[in-house]
Amino acid sequence: MKFLVYAVGHKMPEWIAAGFQEYAKRMPREANIELLEIKPERRDSGKKVEQLLAAEGARIRALLPSNCRLVVMDERGSQWTTAGLAHAIGSWMKDGGDTAFLIGGADGLDPALRNAADEVLALSALTLPHGLVRILLAEQLYRAISLIKGHPYHRA
C-alpha cells in the first residue's frame, strides 16, 4: 500500500519538508508515503475563488491513480482516534490499492473533490497551517502503522 499525500502549496519552509521526510523515512516498505505538491493557482489572476479551486481540483484529479481510496483532510471532517485510524488503515491494507490524502491550500479544496471523497477526516477542530498538516498527517500515518505492527512507538 502506498499513501499519497497531495498538498496544494509550494515553497514551504525547510522545516516542513524535514518534518515530513522524517516520518516518511520511518515507514515500512509495505506502507510507503509520498508527498506530491500541487502548485496553487495565482490569486491575482482576477478569477473567483471557485474557479481557482476548480482548476486546482482538475490538476489533482489528473494525478490521482485510478481506483485509489480518497481521503480529504478538512477541519469539518470526522475526528478519529489513533486506534480508529489504525483500524481503518488495516482494513484498507486488506482491500489493497493506494490511499490518497488531499490537503487543500489557503482557500481549501474544490468542493467536487470533497464530495467524491471516500472519507473526510479532520486532524483537529482547530484550523491548522497547511504545511503543518503535512507533518501531522505523516506522523499519524506512521503512528497508525506502528500500532498495526505492534511497534512500541505508540504507547497510549
From Swiss-Prot:
Q: Which reaction does it catalyse?
A: pseudouridine(1915) in 23S rRNA + S-adenosyl-L-methionine = N(3)-methylpseudouridine(1915) in 23S rRNA + S-adenosyl-L-homocysteine + H(+)
Alphabetized, the UniProt keywords read: Cytoplasm, Methyltransferase, rRNA processing, S-adenosyl-L-methionine, Transferase
Q: Does the keyword Cytoplasm apply?
A: yes
What is this enzyme's EC?
2.1.1.177
The entry's family comment says: Belongs to the RNA methyltransferase RlmH family.
Q: Which residues bind S-adenosyl-L-methionine?
A: G104, L123, S124, A125, L126, T127, L128
Q: Where is this gene product found?
A: Cytoplasm
Q: What is the lineage of its organism?
A: Bacteria, Pseudomonadati, Pseudomonadota, Betaproteobacteria, Nitrosomonadales
Q: How does it assemble?
A: Homodimer.
What this protein is called in its record is: Ribosomal RNA large subunit methyltransferase H
Purpose of the protein = Specifically methylates the pseudouridine at position 1915 (m3Psi1915) in 23S rRNA.
Disulfide bonds, paired cysteine numbers = none
EC class (word) = transferase
Q: What Pfam families does this protein map onto? A: SPOUT_MTase (PF02590)
Molecular function, one GO term:
rRNA (pseudouridine-N3-)-methyltransferase activity
| Recorded name of the encoding gene | rlmH
Q: What is its main location?
A: cytoplasm
Which Gene Ontology CC terms are recorded?
cytoplasm
Which species does the entry assign this protein to? Nitrosospira multiformis (strain ATCC 25196 / NCIMB 11849 / C 71)
